[in-house]
Amino acid sequence: MTQISRQQYADLYGPTIGDKIRLGDSDLYVEIEKDLRATYGDELQYGGGKTLRDGMGSENFLTQEAGCLDLVITNVTVIDAIQGVVKADVGIRNGRIVGLGKAGNPSTMDGVTRGLVTGASTDAISGEHLILTAGGMDTHVHYIAPQQVEAALSNGITTLWGGGIGPVDGTNGVTTTNGPWNLEMMLRSIEGLPINFGIQGKGNSTGIAPLIEHLEAGAAGFKVHEDYGATPAAIRACLSVADEYDVSVAVHTDTLNESGYVEDTIAAFDGRSVHTYHSEGAGGGHAPDLLKVVGQNNILPSSTNPTLPCGKNSVAELFDMIMVCHNLNPKIPSDVAFAESRVRAETIVAESVLHDMGAISMIGSDSQAMGRIGETFLRAIQTADAMKKARGPLPEDAPGNDNFRVLRYIAKVTINPALTAGVGDVIGSIESGKFADLVLWEPAFFGVKPKLVLKGGLVAWANMGDPNASLPTPQPMYYRPMFAAYGSALQKTSITFVSRAAYDKGVADRFGLQRLVMPVSGTRVIGKAHMVRNSYLPNIEVDPQTFAVKVDGVHATVKPPQSISLNQLYFFS
């Protein structure tokens, strides 16, 4: 049998088992654990003189209707919270992931995975020197401006979850779309945006009828926010409706402790599944000890990207952010005191440590309301790297690689938000049958700038050169919408998630929606144990004077880094 060197193989087909990949300019290295392509020597590859040719790697007679793939991503390195770090061909058909394995022509190739047959209907992406992840999900979005979609796609985010109606004061502070009319208008508006949406209704009501009204009008879940009164009574009422209608509830708790302390809010949850925003408290919530929520098995904790990783300037920028977002006046002492109560360096530093331990399960952006929607993937990988440098290897990592740590942070922006919202059966990981929302990255730009963003199996967003050039690559290179972002293809490759109540009442027909409309499900049975690679339940103590955080009796702190990877090397500003 003919043999080639490992270096030659990597040049031709990319890395394989045992090879390591550095992620950007970070100190994070992933190592390929498995190669799902069966055997060496029968690799499928597109290009001149390559194997994806008729009668070779391309089956002669199979039609698309009979199962031929629409798209194959060949020889790609998959980094996925469920799959791990693996080498595979990935097949896509009818907008869904068919599977991972060995693609090609079973008449001429050994070990072709069932369903991954290529033929005349198949196009190709050469993944030999690329990394594939699931599209990211931003679980904390203020719908302030539709242009947020462009920034989100430019960092590999393919699903937005939040609420709002534009740059009004309520939306600047709260991620809810309030009432049936506003919900209808937003559902109509997002028809033209090439990204998945879930809209949260206002959960601040002790009356049941207004909450049900939100769900029947198309809300996919609820948000209870302190600006509208996050009282125990409102929380209990909202959770009761959520239990009946199977939708998620997110809560931004009471910073001022006016209606109770963190223990009172936890008691109001009554053991029911709830997603706590700003679990570190800097973005709002019970001061100073909201972090205690990360030790509860029914609470699904997230935090937002402005304080991740905690750098030397993180604390300094928070005060002005809070004043603007929550309609506060720097001339009013009580408003200033409110803002200052959130800015606690000790709890902000502990946030990064708790993420690294898997105690905080998700990362969102808090878009234009303290956070940056185009940096959610980026901040996740930056935090992973900063924590490796500060805390060393994780106990779960194998010698010589950072696979577990990287996968832990990938889970925070992919599968865990999807599970929390009740859409984990549709998106969030690279698994057979799921919607083909996928992101391709060059290793040098991993987490920073994707190469291609696929929505429903079609390219929606890409780093594209001059359209008048002789090649796709001449300058100016910048992100541009692709064909999945135009025409009726947009509606076939993007999903609007709604409650089952709205779905059953025909919300799509009532509002004339052309996008794919899907109901959420399974939200009330999700607990911390379901958070992939992020299910740790520590005992948290917060000193009321110094704000020092102890995790299982150990002070949780690191020195803020003076410089951060994946940062100024990659950006002009």
Curated annotation (Swiss-Prot):
Residues covered by the Urease domain: 135-573
Positions of modified residues (N6-carboxylysine): 223
Binding of substrate, residues: 225
GO biological process terms on file: urea catabolic process
Note describing how the cofactor binds: Binds 2 nickel ions per subunit.
Enzyme Commission number(s) of this protein: 3.5.1.5
Gene Ontology CC annotations of this record: cytoplasm
CDD domains documented for this protein: Urease_alpha (cd00375)
Reported modifications of this chain: Carboxylation allows a single lysine to coordinate two nickel ions.
GO molecular-function term, one example from the UniProt record: nickel cation binding
Keywords of the record: Cytoplasm, Hydrolase, Metal-binding, Nickel
Residues reported in the UniProt entry to bind Ni(2+) 1: 140, 142, 223, 366
Alphabetized InterPro entries for the sequence: Amidohydro-rel, Metal-dep_hydrolase_composite, Metal_Hydrolase, Rhodanese-like_dom, Urease_alpha_N_dom, Urease_alpha_subunit, Urease_AS, Urease_asu
Quaternary data: Heterotrimer of UreA (gamma), UreB (beta) and UreC (alpha) subunits. Three heterotrimers associate to form the active enzyme.
Protein name (database record): Urease subunit alpha 2
Gene: ureC2
